Amino acid sequence: MPREIITLQLGQCGNQIGFEFWKQLCAEHGISPEGIVEEFATEGTDRKDVFFYQADDEHYIPRAVLLDLEPRVIHSILNSSYAKLYNPENIYLSEHGGGAGNNWGRGFSQGEKIHEDIFDIIDREADGSDSLEGFVLCHSIAGGTGSGLGSYLLERLNDRYPKKLVQTYSVFPNQDEMSDVVVQPYNSLLTLKRLTQNADCVVVLDNTALNRIATDRLHIQNPSFSQINQLVSTIMSASTTTLRYPGYMNNDLIGLIASLIPTPRLHFLMTGYTPLTTDQSVASVRKTTVLDVMRRLLQPKNVMVSTGRDRQTNHCYIAILNIIQGEVDPTQVHKSLQRIRERKLANFIPWGPASIQVALSRKSPYLPSAHRVSGLMMANHTSISSLFESSCQQYDKLWKRGAFLEQFRKEDIFKDNFEEMHRSREVVQELIDEYHAATRPDYISWGTQEQ
């Protein structure tokens, strides 16, 4: 029984990565840009209906809702060769098209105004599913629409569909370069509060690390947005392969999430992928074995989140799930796991078992691949807290100077006071503290002392 997933794409970033994701899924399932199954796509072993549904004339339509407060990106999608793929009723552009002006408050209050229209679309999609498992939200936390409208939607989805899973692919801003959005630290922190309280699982896509990987590993001097988005769509499609090419394990979203998230608040995941090459010569000298792939996945340079060194805290893995695609002998997997444990290649939490799981998945038969084996690691690692710490530091700098607060005061939620900002700062601080506590053996009783 397929458990359907509805994808919500928000704002410029969310719609751009969503667009790449659907392009990738179409290629993997042998679906043309118009949604028609290609003649060569005869293998019936994949499950298309988790992410697509079939219209009356048999062509496939993504279970996707495209939302934006300004038209530029969605118009570019509608002028692309994939324009006919989407259901036009599932596209929502705000009437006045002014956008959220990179302001979380404006994005949030726009959400309140257009709430009815958006949920008409979402409810209709949900009613069209046989057994909806949950929602996947693509957005960035730095701008206005992805952060503000995204936060509003996360809160409402929890109220409206309390039993459905909500997973997000959240793009974190690049810390290495100056941002063109001056209020980004405010936007990020306000969104982080909702990601902590209203999402079941957050896959963190860190622009700093994605840029580093594109430059170091793919040898692209100044990576463009679309090149970074291709990296992201690789991660998104690989993390959903077990849902689309089901095996006997991890073939639904809860199965994926349950193995990675033992305690509810620590649900921010980092990803790693290998082999990442655009260089054909590397393919000819490297033999990709399961052990090779699994060992490379544990190397920091392949991980798509940049975390600083922390001398005070001995950061560790809470859980790892490796999704290995390709020609794989299961006995090899067992040997590789043993080797990783014997050599202590990964440092695990002191209060629970070393949870490293492997899901084997078929590759799409329709896409040529330069590598026999490729792997995606989804990991719950305590060092992700350093990303939240740098968000807090940037926020504190602005807050201390009272910078740019005027822009927020215009919105209803901040009209009388900035209580919402203080509360968000507290929630993120509690999250950081809990990640630090998870590195210690007494974490099991953590939190009971404070109540």
UniProtKB/Swiss-Prot annotation:
Binding, GTP: 142-148
Which Gene Ontology cellular-component terms appear in the entry? centrosome; cytoplasmic microtubule; gamma-tubulin complex; pericentriolar material; spindle microtubule
Alphabetically, the GO molecular function entries are: GTP binding
Which GO biological-process labels does this protein carry?
A: cytoplasmic microtubule organization; microtubule nucleation
Which residues, if any, are the signal sequence?
A: none
Location(s), subcellular: Cytoplasm, Cytoskeleton, Microtubule organizing center, Centrosome
> What are the alphabetically sorted keywords of the record?
Cytoplasm, Cytoskeleton, GTP-binding, Microtubule, Nucleotide-binding, Phosphoprotein
Describe the processing and modification events after translation.
Phosphorylation at Ser-131 by BRSK1 regulates centrosome duplication, possibly by mediating relocation of gamma-tubulin and its associated proteins from the cytoplasm to the centrosome.
Q: Which domain of life is it from?
A: Eukaryota
GTP-binding among the record's keywords? yes
Q: Which Gene3D superfamilies match?
A: Helix hairpin bin, Tubulin/FtsZ, C-terminal domain, Tubulin/FtsZ, GTPase domain
**UniProt record similarity statement:** Belongs to the tubulin family.
Record's function text: Tubulin is the major constituent of microtubules, protein filaments consisting of alpha- and beta-tubulin heterodimers. Gamma-tubulin is a key component of the gamma-tubulin ring complex (gTuRC) which mediates microtubule nucleation. The gTuRC regulates the minus-end nucleation of alpha-beta tubulin heterodimers that grow into microtubule protafilaments, a critical step in centrosome duplication and spindle formation.
Q: Please give the subunit comment from the record.
A: Component of the gamma-tubulin ring complex (gTuRC) consisting of TUBGCP2, TUBGCP3, TUBGCP4, TUBGCP5 and TUBGCP6 and gamma-tubulin TUBG1 or TUBG2. TUBGCP2, TUBGCP3, TUBGCP4, TUBGCP5 and TUBGCP6 assemble in a 5:5:2:1:1 stoichiometry; each is associated with a gamma-tubulin, thereby arranging 14 gamma-tubulins in a helical manner. Gamma-tubulin at the first position is blocked by TUBGCP3 at the last position, allowing 13 protafilaments to grow into a microtubule. Interacts with alpha-beta tubulin heterodimers; the interaction allows microtubules to nucleate from the gTuRC.
Output this protein's name.
Tubulin gamma-2 chain
Q: Which organism is it from?
A: Mus musculus (Mouse)
